[in-house]
């Protein structure tokens, strides 16, 4: 356990961090009751690599053949990180939403719709990049309109 913590605390780069996440993903698939508490702890860590690992380890390259956690579990780990300022965490949020869409398209779209404004531009781009073009364009338009409304509302509050 101590070695596991050391490696995730100070990876040399995102590739090394994600290679570890692939291992954690396999462990999580086999021993969810043992691994999930660690992922939840990492989700609240001040260390951005741990926060990233807390979500990337849930569904590392989703395929229907793999045993995945529930969508509820995955989204409960993603949601607290929606506003994360770290670029690598933002990318992971988008990437995991994209991967979740492969397994749970309906639930993922509901989540995206609900959190359109909460996602950073990076997360939004990654999350929507594999959607059908017309659907992706609708999400972009919705995001644009909601941001415009929010801006107008904030301006009206200043006056």
Q: Can you annotate each of these PLM segments?
A:
Residues 1-159:
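Alpha-helical scaffold domains
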């Amino acid at each position: 356990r101590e070695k596991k913590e050391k490696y995730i605390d100070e990876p040399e780069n995102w590739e090394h961090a994600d290679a570890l996440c692939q291992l954690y993903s396999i462990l999580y698939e086999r021993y969810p009751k043992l691994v999930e508490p660690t992922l939840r702890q990492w989700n609240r860590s001040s260390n951005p690599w741990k926060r990233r690992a807390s979500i990337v380890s849930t569904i590392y390259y989703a395929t229907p053949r793999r045993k995945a956690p529930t969508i509820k579990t995955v989204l409960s780990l993603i949601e607290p990180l929606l506003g994360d300022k770290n670029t690598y965490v933002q990318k992971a949020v988008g990437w995991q939403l994209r991967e979740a869409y492969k397994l749970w398209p309906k639930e993922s779209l509901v989540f995206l719709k609900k959190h359109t404004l909460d996602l950073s531009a990076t997360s939004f781009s990654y999350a929507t990049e594999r959607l059908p073009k017309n659907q992706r364009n609708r999400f972009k338009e919705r995001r644009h309109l909601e941001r415009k409304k929010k801006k107008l509302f904030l301006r009206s509050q200043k006056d």
